[in-house]
């Protein structure tokens, strides 16, 4: 899985991605007429430099038990993606995750576009294999609020309790909490949760659910035991 480390001679590598989306409209494509970049295999970052030769043996290293959970944050906003509005919710989520011990691998600012959101959810869950994806925005009744539908379309298992808990908590603050259509699902070992768009609502909801997420994420990843309490 992503995060696995290998040694080869003096070099130390960490897997960062499995497979790669073809960037069919990149500069290479424009010049060559086709993509010549690799699309298969695994990709790794160099943790410690060294020399690798053809035929060298790659040694799989034990995964440390204390590795931080890995997260990604996606802000959905037409105006934000066009530079017409500052994204305040995304950075707030990053701050709260980091303070709780998560490693935020990526932050994205997208328009309310179903195709773009689906592409990124699939990439982050399947190729990057992050443990948690938090989206913000697009959970209301407006015509372009498509976040829950896209989230459900990539789901392999439902995890409704998280979204239900957020609605319950929001209703203790405002009756408008019932208008949230946020979804929470699992794709593989990745938990995907839709948060509201406003910074105030993001803070209220994330403070409420964040203490319980890590255990669920670790269960999904096969890192923790059962949920039963003695």
Where are these regions (language model features)?
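Short, solvent-exposed amphipathic alpha-helical segments in soluble enzyme
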Residues: 23, 88-91, 207-212
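N-terminal small/polar loop signature for handling phosphorylated ligands or for N-terminal nucleophile
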Residues: 96-98, 103-135, 140-155
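Short beta-strand segments
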Residues: 74-75, 135-136, 194-196
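Glycine-rich phosphate/diphosphate-binding loop of Rossmann-like nucleotide-binding domains
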Residues: 66-112
């Amino acid at each position: 899985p992503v995060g696995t480390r290998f040694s080869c001679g003096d070099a130390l590598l960490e897997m960062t991605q499995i497979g790669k989306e073809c960037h069919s409209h990149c500069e290479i494509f424009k010049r060559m007429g086709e993509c010549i970049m690799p699309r298969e295999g695994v990709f790794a970052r160099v943790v410690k430099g060294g020399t690798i030769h053809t035929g060298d043996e790659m040694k799989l290293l034990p995964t440390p038990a204390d590795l931080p959970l890995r997260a990604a944050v996606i802000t959905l906003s037409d105006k934000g993606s066009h530079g017409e509005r500052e994204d305040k919710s995304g950075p707030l989520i990053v701050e709260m995750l980091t303070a709780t011990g998560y490693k935020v691998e990526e932050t994205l600012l997208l328009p309310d576009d179903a195709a773009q959101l689906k592409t990124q959810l699939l990439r982050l869950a399947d190729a990057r294999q992050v443990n948690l994806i938090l989206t913000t925005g697009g959970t209301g009744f407006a015509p372009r609020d498509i976040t829950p539908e896209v989230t459900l379309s990539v789901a392999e298992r439902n995890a409704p309790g998280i979204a239900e808990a957020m609605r319950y908590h929001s209703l203790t603050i405002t009756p408008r909490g019932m208008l949230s259509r946020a979804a929470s699902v699992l794709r593989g070992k990745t938990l995907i949760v839709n948060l509201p768009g406003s910074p105030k609502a993001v803070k209220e909801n994330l403070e409420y659910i964040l203490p319980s997420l890590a255990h669920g994420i670790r269960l999904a990843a096969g890192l923790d035991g059962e949920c039963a309490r003695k």
